Amino acid sequence: TGQLPKFEEDLFKVPGERDLYLIPTAEVPVTNFFRDVIVKEFPIMCTAYTPCFRREAGSYGKEVRGLNRLHQFDKVEIVQVQHPEKSYETLDSMVIHVASILDELELPYKILQLCGGDLSFSSALTFDFEVYSAGQERWLEVSSVSNFESYQANRLKLRYKDENGKTQLCH
């Protein structure tokens, strides 16, 4: 999914003969359900609620140590596998979905479109959601939604057959 090798230092490695890691996000196991699959029908929609593990704890600074970044946290992940022609439409609907949750919770939020320098190398377009924390007097990222286009599908060999029977990469 693009976590390795770039983010290896932020992951928890399990000691042993094989290179195993605790999951940094449910995106990793969820997308791997579709490794080497040829999709027959779109969209595929998944959600997962998992504990996640990252070494980035405390990266917000000592004034909020232990409040914003923890080594273990629970996270909800939404993943969609889509036809390339519909991937940006799907991204827009996922943005609306996350915004509707924040609206229901009546939380003040803003949506930021990340610039090229802030995107992960695997993402074509990402929107971050930030909620205002009155206690810290700052905006805190609470969600992000991305379109990876064919990046993850290429690594996963996640494909579909087009109208001519030719194998293509999903988004």
Segments and roles (model prediction):
Residues 1-171:
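TRNA-recognition modules of translation machinery and tRNA-sensing kinases, especially anticodon-binding
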